[in-house]
């Protein structure tokens, strides 16, 4: 027995018959093939105000005889787990994405937070996953309420403790990564947690901007002074979290089995945060969202409804892209090597043909290797972008190139997509930001110097 780690099982078909009190409403993996789960009797009319509907519902609802029973049969085909949940207090809403039924069951007491919102978010989540990774192979997916906070995933069913959009997208991601692509969560926790963490971040940043959440629905950011706070990139926050561990001297390999991590923090960073950042770097390496997601679709199509592991994932990436990627994955997964590039020199000379020659000194202060996007800002207002690819096994190099206009500044990895331990030496001109030092303000972007100011008042005691 290992306390850390979750599931691993064989694919099969589950035909499960329930005999429960008629007062209970039930949801489960699979589809109803016989009996009444009780949904129709508690379906919310979302065309009217929720509280008005509850008032009407409570005045007209006829509770079942306490001694009566209901029999329901669920069939779940080609899954490696089965889960169910039942409650006397469930209400029900239903929607559809293409040919997929989307069910939502929630506690009446949380209805104001859940009604309509969770169904909309659930439909958007499954639409996103189908678009980015591939067609969902099951006929339904169900989002249900749970007593505790947080979430838990099963094939075709997730149990969520709140209406959070990020939580819904994360748990639906698990239906793909764990459910459809079935990794051993004891040995390769990163293959599901890391994948759904990065796709959740990308979804939220795509929908709401780099800060990665809906500011209008966050009460904290509707009040003064926090409504005026600058918002930090969600990616930067994850990078800082990983960097703190890397600098601590207590970092561990991502590939380590879950039960061997020294503590919960090490497990969390190495199952969730670091592999998510690794996949962000893979997207950066491909220099194309379309190539990255095309490769992911290839992996998904090849291994859906089968068991996956590290080797099968890496092979799929290499097969599709026709690139050797072992150097990239090996350092991320099997070492604690870190990335730390810097600009060691920047020489610019106007040559005889009225162009500018640049010699950019690049130094690797770390122990991991990456190609680097080089961005040069020019006097004519344009920006030159190119790649330095002489990276493998090199700790220093001079990158020479020619420009039509005078270069003003240079940055390596200008969009801060890599987990470079010290970004300050990645640019010849770091941006400066001056902000008022509000109580409670946390703002620590990786690509800026932040200067905080606040008034201070003193007085002298009179004599």
List the model feature ranges, each with a label.
Residues 27-28, 339-414:
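Beta-strand-rich binding/interaction modules
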